[in-house]
């Protein structure tokens, strides 16, 4: 009998610590609130994007992915921001395989980026 390999996709995530430092320098006391709110928004929008995909709502998914891209860019999550932009493009392309793969990658990156920024900010998960 042939064994079927089990794939466990993983993503290398990174948060641009210089970008986070810039936020804290520019915003001073308000930075904690802004970063916490942005983290919360990402934590809500990532599963919402998955729901929109399952409901076959590509227009709404594109808007959700665009907002994820904007939030991620503000927090220095450059790879997540780029891949969320790719999800937006896939919604317009009409290629269901590309959309499924890219959305899955965005979710993996998003979850990993949130874990990393929580560690950097010393926030409980």
What are the language-model segments listed below?
Residues 1-63, 67-74, 78-125:
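Two-component system phosphorelay core
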């Amino acid at each position: 009998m042939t064994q079927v390999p089990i794939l466990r996709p993983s993503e290398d995530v990174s948060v641009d610590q210089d970008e986070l430092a810039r936020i804290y320098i520019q915003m001073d006391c308000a930075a904690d609130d802004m970063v916490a709110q942005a983290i919360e928004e990402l934590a809500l929008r990532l599963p919402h994007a998955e729901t929109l995909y399952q409901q076959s709502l590509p227009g709404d998914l594109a808007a959700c992915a665009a907002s994820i891209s904007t939030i991620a860019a503000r927090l220095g999550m450059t790879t997540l921001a780029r891949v969320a932009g790719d999800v937006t493009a896939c919604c317009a392309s009409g290629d269901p395989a590309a959309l499924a793969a890219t959305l899955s990658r965005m979710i993996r990156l998003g979850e990993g980026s949130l874990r990393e920024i929580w560690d950097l900010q010393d926030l409980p998960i």
